[in-house]
Amino acid sequence: MLILVTNDDGINAPGIKALSRSLARVGRVAVVAPEKERSAIGHGITMHKPLRATEVTWEGPVEMALAVNGTPADCVKLALDALLDEEPSLVVSGINMGANLGTDVLYSGTVSGALEGCINGRPSLAVSLAGEGGVDFSFAADFTSRLAGVIIKRGLPAGTLLNLNIPCLPPGEIKGLAITRLGRRRYCNTITRRLDPRGRAYYWLAGEVEDLDQEPDTDIGALGQGRISITPLHLDLTNYSYQQELAAYLSFLWPGQGNR
């Protein structure tokens, strides 16, 4: 079986290297990842310039290791449609340096890599380790490979992917595993305005995270309690509970139509 691996930290990031080594115990691995960091790129795809896939040297057993001058979604799309000779049994995106929790999933290139696999009908998994700089990816990689084996055997529902967040703790201090829902967080942005040497304004985007929903059943809450969080996500973003109410108060826009 073949496992496609990508990320948003770039092909030289330590997380993807640890992940590919561990997944090689489960199946054959193909690495197709951005040539440079593309964090917070969301689900952007490249439509206005050529994409190039360049072979790179890789430590460990892989079918291929290619760096792409595009986004994580580009990498998965390109791999599935042009680069691979067979369909992968699983798409894994990660291991990201830093958690992807709550509304982070809407910005995350890591999650979008897995999302692109899901759009194309492949079981898919996004993996993030809640740490910064110099962290040890070995436990996260080992846990991901065990989870990958289960997913390959059991599959996932159509249109569903998993978002995995692992605490940056020694394995003995992790409190267990939680199946969670998305929490809610926002970034209280501080925009810094500066001037370049020519006197033209430019801006830096920064800010602090504010967790608005961190109940114990959320991914944010679970990680805060030292537990591994697995959140099933699906492609359908429809708010079904609001459809009838919306139809009722917008019916005047097209009288007599109703909610067909």
From Swiss-Prot:
Entry-linked Gene3D superfamilies: Survival protein SurE-like phosphatase/nucleotidase
Known EC number: 3.1.3.5
InterPro entries named in the record: SurE, SurE-like_Pase/nucleotidase, SurE-like_sf
Keywords for the protein's UniProt record, in alphabetical order: Cytoplasm, Hydrolase, Metal-binding, Nucleotide-binding
Source organism, top-level taxon: Bacteria
Pfam families on file: SurE
Main location: cytoplasm
Reactions listed under catalytic activity: a ribonucleoside 5'-phosphate + H2O = a ribonucleoside + phosphate
Free-text cofactor note: Binds 1 divalent metal cation per subunit.
One term under GO cellular component: cytoplasm
Subcellular location: Cytoplasm
Any GO MF annotation of the entry: 5'-nucleotidase activity
Ligand binding (a divalent metal cation): D8, D9, S39, N96
Cofactor(s) needed for function: a divalent metal cation
Job of this protein: Nucleotidase that shows phosphatase activity on nucleoside 5'-monophosphates.
Annotated HAMAP family: SurE (MF_00060)
UniProt record similarity statement: Belongs to the SurE nucleotidase family.
PANTHER family named in the record: 5'-NUCLEOTIDASE SURE, 5'_3'-NUCLEOTIDASE SURE
The protein's name: 5'-nucleotidase SurE
Gene symbol of the encoding locus: surE
